[in-house]
Amino acid sequence: MMKSVFFGVVAITVAILSIYQETAQAQEQTVGATDNYQWDSVDDQCLAALHRQINKEFDASIIYLKYAAYFAQEKINLPGFEKFFFHSAAEEREHGIKLIEYALMRGKAPVDKHFKLNYDHEVPTVTTGESALETALQKEVEVTKSIRGVIKACEDGSNDFHLADYLTGEYLDEQHKGQRELAEKIATLKKMKKSAPKLGEFLFDKNHM
């Protein structure tokens, strides 16, 4: 399973970098044609922030894949947590792909030369569901702050209200709902572990994930 997760992430990386190279070449070839028709105009600061956000979405997906693989191990066997984190990983990957599609729709390369996936986050050899959910909540808060940063960069730099509105409507609402859901899960799990220290996590995995 770990191999399939790894190769899946590698495939995403290769595909994204390939898109970047092809789009960059196409932009170089058509630069003369776009000098007089700025349909693809996006402020540099705004575009750089969008590139960073795309990177963050895929980074979050990798972290959630690692936790999903951890809980899927036969010696851990918490299928509720496994399903939750695989679903979360898929959502973050979808977010990244949607931003790639948006950048392409605006006539821009979806990633720049600084694009690099972060594999450094290590899941401890022994971890708990509570710890994993708290890590996920921290990551979602980080992603939300980053989205707000993109919105600010695009509004302040060139009044790019289309991108700002897209991020506000498509992303921020889902981010805030996701953070609330994670906070509720953490609170419920803590209560169950307090009332049943040995069975709390098992019952939570079965009934609340």
Swiss-Prot record:
**What does this protein's UniProt record list under function?**
Stores iron in a soluble, non-toxic, readily available form. Important for iron homeostasis. Has ferroxidase activity. Iron is taken up in the ferrous form and deposited as ferric hydroxides after oxidation.
Which InterPro entries does its entry note?
A: Ferritin, Ferritin-like, Ferritin-like_diiron, Ferritin-like_SF, Ferritin_DPS_dom
What are its E.C. numbers? 1.16.3.1
Question: What Pfam families does the database record attribute to this sequence?
Answer: Ferritin
Q: What is the lineage of its organism?
A: Eukaryota, Metazoa, Ecdysozoa, Arthropoda, Hexapoda
Which reaction does this enzyme catalyse, per its entry? Answer: 4 Fe(2+) + O2 + 4 H(+) = 4 Fe(3+) + 2 H2O
Which Gene3D superfamilies does its entry note? Answer: 1.20.1260.10
Q: What is its main location?
A: secreted
The UniProt subunit note reads as follows: Oligomer of 24 subunits. There are two types of subunits: L (light) chain and H (heavy) chain. The functional molecule forms a roughly spherical shell with a diameter of 12 nm and contains a central cavity into which the insoluble mineral iron core is deposited.
Specify the protein name. Ferritin heavy chain
Q: What are the residue boundaries of the Ferritin-like diiron domain, all occurrences included? A: 40-193
GO molecular function (one): ferric iron binding
User: TM segments?
Assistant: none
Induction conditions: By blood meal, iron and hydrogen peroxide (at protein level).
Which residues make up the binding site for Fe cation 2?
Answer: E92, E140, Q175
Which keywords are on file for this protein?
Answer: Cytoplasm, Iron, Iron storage, Metal-binding, Oxidoreductase, Secreted, Signal
